[in-house]
């Protein structure tokens, strides 16, 4: 029974997240249905990061076991054929050993949050950015972000319904940069950690936005973290601006 590793790209807009639900469309359910249609088998996918409703991915990783030994290009192409016209693409498929687990073998996950920072709304990218029309200072946002790096109790930045056993996480990267392409003004928040709490990235993005418009200082952000003052955080940034961009595995 071979195990296949899939690299997956999807637009999260039409889906109620990754994880299969009884009555709502999800990315997991769509791919598992495609697996059944091409192989005749019922397989359960395990992914690296269970994205929320509306969150996108350009390098999600999942694994599944199938009884038959299929060519990897057949797996990729057959799944893509059965997934049409849904906005999901299987970018690659490869056979891996059974000690590989897309979720538990991961040593680092990467997310990107995009803020369109100009007066005019987005026409082409509206489903992939958070439009903030007032001026933001990316340097102030970056300075505040550095106060969140390291191992901390991130209770202030977790969802009330978060099921993680511990709120302690080690944030390895949280960088904020401004990117300009003509009239396109975008602020990009890039972050990496072994794992994140439910809504952590979106909560941090909303709080950093307040730092960018000078409603919070870097010291304020550090104090919110230290005192777990969730009521002082910024708004929960909308899901559409968040993308799962990659996952690292130990090469051993």
Curated annotation (Swiss-Prot):
Q: Name one Pfam family in it.
A: PseudoU_synth_1
Give the GO terms filed under biological process for this record.
tRNA pseudouridine synthesis
The catalytic activity of this protein is classed by the Enzyme Commission as 5.4.99.12
Q: Which UniProt keywords apply?
A: Isomerase, tRNA processing
- What does the record give under GO molecular function? RNA binding; tRNA pseudouridine(38-40) synthase activity
Checking InterPro entries in the record gives: PsdUridine_synth_cat_dom_sf, PsdUridine_synth_TruA, PsdUridine_synth_TruA_a/b_dom, PsdUridine_synth_TruA_C, TruA/RsuA/RluB/E/F_N
What is the top EC class of this enzyme, as a single word? isomerase
Q: Which reaction does it catalyse?
A: uridine(38/39/40) in tRNA = pseudouridine(38/39/40) in tRNA
Keyword S-adenosyl-L-methionine among UniProt keywords: no
Source domain of life is: Bacteria
Q: Give me the residues that bind substrate, please.
A: 111
Q: Where is the active site?
A: 52 (nucleophile)
Q: Which family does it belong to?
A: Belongs to the tRNA pseudouridine synthase TruA family.
Q: What does this protein do?
A: Formation of pseudouridine at positions 38, 39 and 40 in the anticodon stem and loop of transfer RNAs.
Quaternary state and interactors: Homodimer.
**Would you tell me the protein name for this molecule?**
tRNA pseudouridine synthase A
């Amino acid at each position: 029974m071979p195990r296949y590793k899939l690299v997956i790209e999807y637009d999260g807009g039409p889906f109620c997240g990754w994880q299969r639900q009884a009555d709502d469309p999800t990315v997991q359910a769509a791919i598992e249905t495609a697996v059944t249609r091409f192989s005749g088998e019922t397989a359960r996918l395990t992914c690296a990061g269970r994205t929320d409703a509306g969150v996108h991915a350009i390098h999600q990783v999942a694994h599944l076991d199938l009884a038959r030994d299929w060519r990897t290009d057949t797996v990729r192409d057959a799944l893509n054929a059965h997934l049409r016209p849904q906005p999901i693409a299987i970018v690659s498929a490869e056979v891996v050993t059974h000690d590989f687990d897309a979720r538990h073998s991961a040593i680092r996950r990467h997310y990107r949050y995009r803020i369109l920072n100009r007066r005019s709304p987005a026409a082409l990218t509206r489903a992939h950015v958070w439009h903030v029309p007032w001026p933001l200072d990316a340097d102030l946002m970056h300075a505040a972000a550095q106060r969140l790096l390291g191992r901390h109790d991130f209770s202030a930045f977790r969802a009330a319904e978060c099921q993680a056993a511990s709120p302690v996480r080690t944030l390895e990267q949280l960088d904020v940069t401004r990117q300009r392409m003509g009239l396109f003004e975008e602020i990009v928040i890039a972050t990496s950690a072994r794992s994140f709490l439910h809504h952590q990235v979106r909560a941090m993005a909303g709080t950093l936005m307040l730092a960018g418009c000078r409603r919070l200082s870097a010291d304020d952000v550090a104090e919110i973290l230290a005192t777990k003052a969730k009521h002082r955080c910024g708004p929960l940034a909308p899901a559409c601006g968040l993308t799962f961009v990659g996952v690292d595995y130990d090469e051993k």
